[in-house]
A protein has these predicted regions:
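Conserved short alpha-helical segments that host acidic/polar catalytic motifs at enzyme active sites
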Residues: 1-221, 225
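Short "domain-exit" segments at the C-terminal end of structured domains
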Residues: 226-230
Length: 230
């Protein structure tokens, strides 16, 4: 049988950048990183940008170069933007619809966050049913939306986004990696067993880059020093 008998896919790919110096075009960096991670997911993609605390983004079905035309990418490029997240999706759970594309942006009573997720939750259906019984309304069918609801609920109850993510991870079962962007912070996390890959790079001007694979660090148009695999 040919090596190319099956479609190319590698689950999903996540990316995040925090540019402390504010000298990089973080939207362009996210685009280049997603292009490098395209082999991990070909169904949909998205980028969210933090422009001085205001989070906006674009996501849709299609390949990176199809979804992010020069006009779309230009609308995300802001001189004061210092953080961005990005995602390429191959559906391991949920349908192939735009509502399942990432990053998912949530606006709640304590602010706004954008969340990217790679992996699978073995208790996603159980968590979804619990949330629906509490009044949650889901627009898609992915595990990621379940995680978004849990982080949001915990953020409304807890003192920080870090604690909210930690409390959420206490009830998640499965293999996953996360990149979460709030108005002031960029946070990356993995399941306790570290099954899903996540690389970390540092920026020479100060800041960090997170990605599912080191190829995204090499091709994100940023000089990466000391990339390490976590």
């Amino acid at each position: 049988m040919s090596d190319f008998a099956y479609p190319l896919h590698e689950e999903c790919g996540v990316f995040g950048i925090y540019d402390r110096a504010g000298t990089e075009d973080v939207a362009a960096a996210a685009y280049s990183a997603l292009y490098a991670l395209q082999h991990r997911g070909q169904e949909s993609c998205g980028i969210a940008v933090n422009d001085d605390g205001v989070i906006n983004g674009h996501r849709d079905l299609g390949l990176v170069n199809e979804v992010f035309t020069p006009a779309v990418l230009g609308s995300l490029a802001k001189p004061t933007a210092h953080m961005a997240t990005g995602h390429v999706r191959y559906a391991t759970s949920g349908s192939r619809i735009r509502a399942n594309a990432q990053p998912m942006i949530v606006r709640h009573g304590r602010g706004t966050m954008a969340l990217c997720h790679n992996g699978n939750l073995t208790n996603a259906l159980e968590l979804r049913r619990q949330l629906e019984n509490e009044g949650a309304i889901f627009h898609g069918s992915s595990d990621t939306e379940v995680i978004c609801y849990l982080v949001t609920r915990n953020r409304l109850r807890m003192g920080s986004i870090e604690i909210a993510i930690s409390k959420t991870m206490d009830v998640l079962e499965g293999a996953y990696s996360l990149v979460v962007m709030s108005a002031t912070k960029l946070i990356a996390a993995r399941d306790p067993r570290g099954y899903r890959p996540l690389c970390i790079g540092t920026l020479p001007g100060g800041g960090y880059v997170f990605a599912s694979e080191s190829c995204a660090l090499d091709l994100s148009l940023i000089h990466i020093s000391e990339p390490t695999r976590r």
